[in-house]
Amino acid sequence: MSRFVQDLSKAMSQDGASQFQEVILQELELSVKKELEKILTTAASHEFEHTKKDLDGFRKLFHRFLQEKGPSVDWGKIQRPPEDSIQPYEKIKARGLPDNISSVLNKLVVVKLNGGLGTSMGCKGPKSLIGVRNENTFLDLTVQQIEHLNKTYNTDVPLVLMNSFNTDEDTKKILQKYNHCRVKIYTFNQSRYPRINKESLLPIAKDVSYSGENTEAWYPPGHGDIYASFYNSGLLDTFIEEGKEYIFVSNIDNLGATVDLYILNHLMNPPNGKRCEFVMEVTNKTRADVKGGTLTQYEGKLRLVEIAQVPKAHVDEFKSVSKFKIFNTNNLWISLGAVKRLQEQNAIDMEIIVNPKTLDGGLNVIQLETAVGAAIKSFENSLGINVPRSRFLPVKTTSDLLLVMSNLYSLNAGSLTMSEKREFPTVPLVKLGSSFTKVQDYLRRFESIPDMLELDHLTVSGDVTFGKNVSLKGTVIIIANHGDRIDIPPGAVLENKIVSGNLRILDH
């Protein structure tokens, strides 16, 4: 929170100050409105309407930001969800599949969140275009999955990509390679909002461009923006007119987020005859997931609570694996009709995430964002489904990439499944050091991906390279201290080993 708002909060505690505070907030809103109007005048005629919608959306979000004070949840009101509000996946699966699978599939639209760049893994351009398996990218695998469904069941499930202004151009260039595939692909852009100065709370952008000194002035406001952007794009109405009823939304970097026919059947043919408007897939927490958002019961409705909303005194309790056993995978099944109704009623309520950033020049700014899952409380008859961990396979780092490239997984029609040769269903814990952060460096350090079928835990730190056909089993820790280098020789088998010091293998 900025110093400006902190000062206002102090003023709240003084008698008669709330009226003064109200005036200050109104002045600030007026200043922001004027700045946004100035920015809008710089828009070319072909981008005027689109820019106006974006800036109007930002103004509403900014207004809400000024109204909110303190943590957005009252900890005393948080309860565990009732038993029937989170169903085990096994129960959903036990209902089986309908005789006519194509009839339910034809009601579905697959939406992938494709706004992110590959910068955290040292790549330029959209993250979805990074190669993850046999030179297939995230996007390739997604298209293969949906094409397989359409061919197998003779259906017409479309793929929709929610791009950001950061990923749109590069993604569209690549889409032509799928022209021959049996998948209709649509795109729409999430909004482009102005970053605001942390102290003055005014937009730092001077015009609508996002090049030159304005490059850092704009941001995509989180995936909660999907509801407004999807509606504004016209695609929502198009799909409703075509008879589609549900969207399956997931992050494009979650390789476990495939279309699940059992969940879809449960949505289309509910046992009690009452359709769910919103289903969130959750899975059991491990100690690695303590920061993930969790589903709770709050004021009589299911509500997603994120760590940022929790009062400081209760953060440890929130992280507890025993009290809050599940977390949100961000695999969501949402009724198209409900999105349209709520969007038109302006009734989708999502908590604001205040994301502070420091720009390259040292300026401190704030991004106001929302998360797609936070809207669960706005929908009727919402449900959580506790799914197997295999439906949550995100690739955020090269450590994750090593797992999905390895023989732990088999690839079939774009879907990754745990190898049958792995004796236990858990995934090894892999921690690669900073020398492996960038994909380019990571690939250079592995002549081939090691055999990891019997691996439990791998930690690698420092200047380490792996020869061909290395096998890793049990717990393996490899640490090259500063100035040292370790080359793991081709064909080496490391089982429950700690390797440190210096090990050079030189060609002769």
From Swiss-Prot:
Keywords annotated in UniProt: Acetylation, Cytoplasm, Magnesium, Metal-binding, Nucleotidyltransferase, Phosphoprotein, Transferase
Region span, Critical for end-to-end subunit interaction: 502-503
Enzyme class: transferase
One GO location term (cellular component): cytosol
Positions of Mg(2+) binding: K127, D253
Binding site for substrate: G115, G116, H223, N251, I252, D253
Gene Ontology MF term list: D-glucose binding; identical protein binding; metal ion binding; pyrimidine ribonucleotide binding; UTP-monosaccharide-1-phosphate uridylyltransferase activity; UTP:glucose-1-phosphate uridylyltransferase activity
Catalytic activity, reaction form: alpha-D-glucose 1-phosphate + UTP + H(+) = UDP-alpha-D-glucose + diphosphate
GO biological process, one term: UDP-alpha-D-glucose metabolic process
N6-acetyllysine modifications at: K438
Phosphoserine PTM positions: S13, S434, S448, S461
Pfam family, one: UDPGP
Region listing for Oligomerization, in residue ranges: 457-508
Binding site for UTP: L113, N114, G115, G116, K127, Q190, G222, D253, K396
Protein name, UniProt field: UTP--glucose-1-phosphate uridylyltransferase
Lineage: Eukaryota, Metazoa, Chordata, Craniata, Vertebrata
